[in-house]
Amino acid sequence: MRKVKIGLALGSGAARGWSHIGVINTLNQMGIDVDIVAGCSIGSLVGSAYACGKLPELESWVRSFSYWDVLRLMDLSWQRGGLLRGERVFNQFRKIMPLADFSHCQMPFGAVATNLSTGRELWLTEGDIHLAVRASCSMPGLMAPVPHNGYWLVDGGVVNPVPISLTRAMGADIGIAAVSYTHLRAHET
């Protein structure tokens, strides 16, 4: 009998997305083995660290944040298509994850970005993982778009904020969606 493959989709959500670290730790404590991970925006950053075996290092870095550390990571830019360049954050990410290729992942991983030319999502599953995460996190207006193969890429949350469809396309039989944004509200009657 074939093992059921479990996919984990880590959604967008800005700083709330750090909660994905807790979701992963809880799944591990419950004995739920994830086979495939996909992420969008902050979910791609956390998901890539998890897929590459670097989640403890990322968690340690995040837990060390002070208010002032967060402010120091903000590198304002008025020229590159976004309020922030994002280089300080992603330089730190590169220190945590020095291996830059999807082939270094211990499990299949994919990131979702949005192609500005077509308005469609782009699934990034091979090549430069740093570029994929940077593109997936590039919130329009806040961070500059990322050039890739003649196109400009921005945050995957524009079109697919919780990429459960990507986990399915990568072979997951069952999908677990981790949602950290608060756009969903209870409807009062």
Where are these regions (language model features)?
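Short acidic-glycine loop/turn motifs at beta-strand connectors
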Residues: 115-118, 149
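Conserved small-residue
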Residues: 13, 23, 43, 111, ...
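ATP/pyrophosphate-binding catalytic subdomain of soluble kinases
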Residues: 127-172
